[in-house]
Amino acid sequence: MSRKGPSKKHQLLPDPIYGSTVVAQLINKILLDGKKSIAEDIVYSALDMVKEKTDQEPVAVLKRALDNIRPSLEVRSRRVGGATYQVPVEVKPGRANTLSLRWLTDFSRARREKTMAERLANEILDASNGLGASVKRREDTHKMAEANKAFAHYRW
């Protein structure tokens, strides 16, 4: 176990086109096999599609989508005696942001459109309108936390 204390958070540089750290995080989530240029192409073309379809600033639409996906509660397993309880806990802001980006990319990959850029653009548009699989995932997470509210006193 390290004696130096907790590791420092890596400060992410904003992306070169939009100047946004959120877009840079999304590029890193889309990244597969270290092919960052392909991930950048996917994200930038998806944001161009969002701009064409909505006539709004694509980063603002992306942030609105992430706000609609971002969970405030989740359940964590806690073993007490012989039983394992699903204990609802509040989600820290950093983890909430990570979960929203992860769900956005995962459910984009699961969509049926032809290219990944189309899938990502449509998932962003759906999420910004409060629709889509990623928003449903957040609602399911909140329902699970609500259903297990009785075990909230096991929180740590």
From Swiss-Prot:
Protein name: Small ribosomal subunit protein uS7
Any GO MF annotation of the entry: rRNA binding
Keywords, alphabetical: Ribonucleoprotein, Ribosomal protein, RNA-binding, rRNA-binding, tRNA-binding
Keyword hit for Lipid biosynthesis: no
Coiled coil: none
CC per GO annotation: small ribosomal subunit
GO biological process: translation
Alphabetical list of NCBIfam families matching this protein: rpsG_bact
Assembly, per entry: Part of the 30S ribosomal subunit. Contacts proteins S9 and S11.
